[in-house]
Design a protein with these regions (language model features):
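GHKL (Bergerat-fold) ATPase N-terminal catalytic module, capturing the glycine-rich phosphate-binding loop
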Residues: 1-176, 181-182
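Glycine/threonine-rich ATP-lid/beta-loop region of ATP-binding domains
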Residues: 173-200
Length: 200
């Protein structure tokens, strides 16, 4: 068998979405279970809690119609709804779809010593490696609700937020893809250990 020549045609560039879906283990580590996706989203909620924003984080894992739906909600400060960046994406959309987008890079010390997870990567990882993901955030009397399919932005809704009992917060839910994980469910032993460390 002749050796295959390596030339300029062998070099190609992938988008962050394409690369992450081709090599999920680079960011997710062990891809036996989808545990890391939950860890990343929970870590974001914990970062808010540690800064004094909110006092409740809820995790719900549901198995229905042979599909897993994982949900994390908090009553932290939430994202600023409908705040549009120079690239035309809202802050919320970019935070879940544009790699290396984060509010934890500045040197103002706000998150110093508190930030968990893969800053600027974790929420995108969850989006990229799920069949679908949706996130709703609310604050200042407004909300923004966005949907992704296979890591690609699908649609957005926004409007007034009238629930005075929940003035601010964020809810993220997703369906991890079996294409990238041997088992799309989470390893509950790992999650229980993580939560025990956090609450202690």
């Amino acid at each position: 068998m002749a050796n295959k020549l390596y030339d300029e045609s062998s070099i190609e560039s992938l988008s962050p979405l394409e690369f992450t879906r081709l090599r999920p283990g680079v960011y997710a580590g062990d891809t036996t279970y989808s545990t890391q996706l939950l860890v990343e989203i929970v870590s974001n909620a914990i970062d808010e809690f540690r800064l004094g924003h909110g006092n409740e984080i809820k995790v719900d894992i549901c198995y229905m119609n042979e599909k897993y739906r994982i949900e994390v909600s908090d009553n932290g400060q939430g994202f600023i709804p409908n705040s549009v960046r120079e690239d035309g994406k809202t802050v919320l959309e970019a935070s879940f779809s544009v790699l290396n987008t984060s509010g934890k890079y500045t040197e103002d010390g706000v998150y110093e010593g508190t930030a968990l997870g893969l800053n600027g990567i974790g929420s995108k990882l969850c989006c990229y490696l799920s069949h679908w993901l949706e996130v709703i955030t609310w604050r200042d009397g407004k909300y923004e609700h966005i949907w992704f399919k296979e890591g690609v932005f699908s649609k957005r809704e926004s409007g007034k937020w009238n629930n005075k009992d929940k003035p601010s917060g964020t809810l993220v839910q997703w369906n991890p893809s079996e294409e990238f994980f041997n088992h799309p469910e989470v390893d509950m032993n790992v999650i229980k250990k993580l939560f025990n460390v956090i609450v202690c």
